[in-house]
Amino acid sequence: MPALTLTRLLRIGEGRTVKRLAHLADEVLALGSDYEQLTDAELRAKTDEFKQRYADGETLDDLLLEAFAVAREASWRVLNQKHYKVQVMGGAALHLGNIAEMKTGEGKTLTCVLPAYLNALSGDGVHVVTVNDYLAKRDAEWMGRVHRFLGLEVGVILGGMTPPQRRVAYAADITYGTNNEFGFDYLRDNMAHSLDDLVQRGHNFAVVDEVDSILIDEARTPLIISGPADASSKWYAEFARIAPLLKKDVHYEVDIKKRTIGVHEAGVEFVEDQLGIDNLYEAANSPLVSYLNNAIKAKELYQRDKDYIVRDGEVIIVDEFTGRILVGRRYNEGMHQAIEAKEGVEIQPENQTLATITLQNYFRLYDKLSGMTGTAETEAAELHQIYNLGVVPIPTNKPMIRVDQSDLIYKTEEAKFNAVVDDVAERHEKGQPVLIGTTSVERSEYLSKQFTRRGIPHSVLNAKFHEQEAQIIAEAGRPGAVTVATNMAGRGTDIVLGGNPDIIADILLRKQGLDPVETPEEYEAAWLPTLEQVKAQTAADADAVREAGGLYVLGTERHESRRIDNQLRGRSGRQGDPGESRFYLSLGDELMRRFNGAALEAIMTRLNLPDDVPIEAKMVSKAIKSAQTQVEQQNFEIRKNVLKYDEVMNQQRTVIYGERNRILRGEDMEGQVQNMITDVITAYVDGATAEGYVEDWDLEKLWTALKTLYPVSLDYRELTGELDGEPRDLSREELREALLEDAHSAYAKREQEIDGLAGEGSMRNLERQVLLSVLDRKWREHLYEMDYLKEGIGLRAMAQRDPLVEYQREGFDMFTAMLDGLKEESVGFLFNLQVEVQQPQPTGVSVDPGLRSPVGATVPAPAPAAPTPLLAKGITDQAPRGLNYIGPDEGGRASVHSDAEEYGGGTPAAAGTRRERREAARAEGKGKRGPKSRRKH
């Protein structure tokens, strides 16, 4: 309930905001007549004028009225669409960093043109985020026509694009793409080994389309880049041999319900005998414990042909709920490898997390964030709490006259679907278009078979082929059209009564080989005549559909979120058109089963109602709404929990990525390295002198450790007076100062040696090489350890401890330890690396992966010539290969794809030489001229 109270509080002052936006919109509309008089060239010149005024000190708020008026006039000349007052209000709300709640069909895509144009004038880039690649490409081409006409560059980020193509797209004034693509590019940039490999250029302003879907539905699944771990597969095979020898209830116990195992003392002793070790639990052997646990779990908890199948020498997971095989999915934390070892198939490398971020924390990187949706009101509290975004409801352009009928509840699912088919057949007969919403692909296919059996022509959309689905949705408003769609299918495309003329005209032009990006001039010349021709065809159909009652939306099941139900309903009744909606439910529906469906079934049984007679009661509708509210609250808590845990990682990630950025950008790291030497020597001395008296210090042991770190020139016996036979008291401070002076002196000699070998400035380059390599490896190891910590942290609740507080505390301790290890390893490498001058590489020949192909002349050193590149053995700048990308699909579920899919078979992050990348960028940049307007002057 607190969220509901907060929602009401957040809506206080809404009226004032809407009035302010309406006043701004009136002023923009009043400027319209001034800009109508301008020629195309004069209108385009306004962009440069605005940029100059911004550079001279005017703010974007100062430019808002004029910039909006220019973009509005350009939209009319290019698209034959002029923003309504409510769309201008929506655009202003977006610019001010709010979520504009605009009903379906109110023109959100066109609305976005206004704030995107205004904010692009700053030159810092604008990101427009959509739910799938098709919409990103469509909007970049379609709305990009307006921006290109006004002299701005538009880019689009799609799956399968190479890094040079992505770099060009991000360099554009406005960049379209999906949340996953933007997020993964951010993570990859923070795995890059050279400035040339970076693709993004900052996070200035983002407009998120379908903001509730992206920031809420998909926020439960974090973005993860994983790659092969370094673990050896030898141990999987060894423990697969041992596991069958262990006896249940003698060596270990199993809890089938909780899916856990526990190893007894007898089991530990048996394993120690088998491996020939003294203590399984000593520090050096601790990794073996997880191999043992996984081997026993593979034996007892994972059954072949139930939990997984073996096909073509590969272990494939079976979904426990649907029974479908999940190709490409793998169990994590070594479990999949343990099953592979048990089955005797080839053991694939274990994956580990290399980089991760939640969508919440990614979008909080932006200086300004805004979004559009038709249904944000129910989640206003969450959007405010997590993203600090206000929700502004924008009035509809025309009054809504759709009729929302009350729900019909049937006893069985079969009776419900029979009633659905009867209702659809009747409406199809009278020429009324029908959109049927389902919650799954299986339900869609089942209904499709029923319609085929009854001879009802129909189309099925399953959110798999977005481009074809947009074409079907464009014609879903035709008389008598019947369209079956899952909740996610065909989003972003309006169902216009009689047919969507813009989409249909675009399809016709593309069939003729015309394209708004590739052939802008020919496309623009043919656009208006084709559009007028299509409008003439669809106008008559639209009148017939209005006579039949408009679009009828039929839901076959209530979704657990009211928002999804409202999205489905919102397909009907756009722009003041007539329409109708109704939900058909059954007691077998998921939501009804979860929340007191048994009580309702008892009532229906007592009333002795036949299966095919529905009940229609407000009490039931209220109960369903209450159930949905409970589920929404549960999901909110899950997302909040994900965010709380990621907040720990986020602070650590900010430190590490900030440090990486400094190194990549060529900052002088000498001061930092000197501080590292001081910290490491101090830690060594403090550890060795923890006992208060000199006679208790083991200085020989300290010197042995120091000699592995750097070439020590001091003799401790000299410091204590043993050499000259005059023992003297040595304080901890004196010892520390002497060693620090010696270490810094040794580092100065090392710098002379390196600079003498490869030229002045070479030591600075080596520092950057070493720090970057060690930082990346330590961060990967830290992520691996944090994954393990998070996996078992929930058990702390059994000891009356808050798992989150424990995770924060231990996570901080682990991070501090990781930073200490990073300093120690970096200092050791810098003193002891074997370095040789790199011979020039012939074109096309790659450097051995075990060697560092170093940074060239990235530092503006005052030396007469750039330092010669060095090879440092054991240091690598090669980006990890064979990566997997895990992120939410449109339904919020985790989906996995590989490097090859992400880059379309191209090479990952460091694709091509610098010259090749520049050539690709130039080629990509060609043909970016703005289209000509149809208007003649």
Swiss-Prot record:
<comment type="subunit">
    <text>Monomer and homodimer. Part of the essential Sec protein translocation apparatus which comprises SecA, SecYEG and auxiliary proteins SecDF. Other proteins may also be involved.</text>
</comment>
<dbReference type="GO" id="GO:0005829">
    <property type="term" value="C:cytosol"/>
</dbReference>
<dbReference type="InterPro" id="IPR014018">
    <property type="entry name" value="SecA_motor_DEAD"/>
</dbReference>
<dbReference type="InterPro" id="IPR000185">
    <property type="entry name" value="SecA"/>
</dbReference>
<dbReference type="InterPro" id="IPR036670">
    <property type="entry name" value="SecA_X-link_sf"/>
</dbReference>
<dbReference type="InterPro" id="IPR001650">
    <property type="entry name" value="Helicase_C-like"/>
</dbReference>
<keyword id="KW-0067">ATP-binding</keyword>
<dbReference type="InterPro" id="IPR011130">
    <property type="entry name" value="SecA_preprotein_X-link_dom"/>
</dbReference>
<keyword id="KW-0811">Translocation</keyword>
<protein>
    <recommendedName>
        <fullName>Protein translocase subunit SecA</fullName>
        <ecNumber>7.4.2.8</ecNumber>
    </recommendedName>
</protein>
<keyword id="KW-0963">Cytoplasm</keyword>
<dbReference type="GO" id="GO:0005886">
    <property type="term" value="C:plasma membrane"/>
</dbReference>
<feature type="binding site">
    <location>
        <begin position="105"/>
        <end position="109"/>
    </location>
    <ligand>
        <name>ATP</name>
    </ligand>
</feature>
<dbReference type="Pfam" id="PF21090">
    <property type="entry name" value="P-loop_SecA"/>
</dbReference>
<keyword id="KW-0547">Nucleotide-binding</keyword>
<feature type="binding site">
    <location>
        <position position="87"/>
    </location>
    <ligand>
        <name>ATP</name>
    </ligand>
</feature>
<dbReference type="GO" id="GO:0005524">
    <property type="term" value="F:ATP binding"/>
</dbReference>
<dbReference type="GO" id="GO:0043952">
    <property type="term" value="P:protein transport by the Sec complex"/>
</dbReference>
<dbReference type="InterPro" id="IPR027417">
    <property type="entry name" value="P-loop_NTPase"/>
</dbReference>
<dbReference type="GO" id="GO:0008564">
    <property type="term" value="F:protein-exporting ATPase activity"/>
</dbReference>
<dbReference type="InterPro" id="IPR044722">
    <property type="entry name" value="SecA_SF2_C"/>
</dbReference>
<dbReference type="InterPro" id="IPR011116">
    <property type="entry name" value="SecA_Wing/Scaffold"/>
</dbReference>
<feature type="compositionally biased region" description="Basic and acidic residues">
    <location>
        <begin position="913"/>
        <end position="927"/>
    </location>
</feature>
<keyword id="KW-1278">Translocase</keyword>
<comment type="function">
    <text>Part of the Sec protein translocase complex. Interacts with the SecYEG preprotein conducting channel. Has a central role in coupling the hydrolysis of ATP to the transfer of proteins into and across the cell membrane, serving as an ATP-driven molecular motor driving the stepwise translocation of polypeptide chains across the membrane.</text>
</comment>
<dbReference type="Pfam" id="PF01043">
    <property type="entry name" value="SecA_PP_bind"/>
</dbReference>
<dbReference type="GO" id="GO:0017038">
    <property type="term" value="P:protein import"/>
</dbReference>
<keyword id="KW-0653">Protein transport</keyword>
<dbReference type="Pfam" id="PF07516">
    <property type="entry name" value="SecA_SW"/>
</dbReference>
<dbReference type="GO" id="GO:0065002">
    <property type="term" value="P:intracellular protein transmembrane transport"/>
</dbReference>
<feature type="binding site">
    <location>
        <position position="494"/>
    </location>
    <ligand>
        <name>ATP</name>
    </ligand>
</feature>
<dbReference type="GO" id="GO:0031522">
    <property type="term" value="C:cell envelope Sec protein transport complex"/>
</dbReference>
<keyword id="KW-1003">Cell membrane</keyword>
<dbReference type="InterPro" id="IPR014001">
    <property type="entry name" value="Helicase_ATP-bd"/>
</dbReference>
<dbReference type="InterPro" id="IPR020937">
    <property type="entry name" value="SecA_CS"/>
</dbReference>
<dbReference type="InterPro" id="IPR011115">
    <property type="entry name" value="SecA_DEAD"/>
</dbReference>
<comment type="similarity">
    <text>Belongs to the SecA family.</text>
</comment>
<dbReference type="GO" id="GO:0006605">
    <property type="term" value="P:protein targeting"/>
</dbReference>
<feature type="region of interest" description="Disordered">
    <location>
        <begin position="881"/>
        <end position="937"/>
    </location>
</feature>
<dbReference type="Pfam" id="PF07517">
    <property type="entry name" value="SecA_DEAD"/>
</dbReference>
<keyword id="KW-0813">Transport</keyword>
<feature type="compositionally biased region" description="Basic and acidic residues">
    <location>
        <begin position="890"/>
        <end position="900"/>
    </location>
</feature>
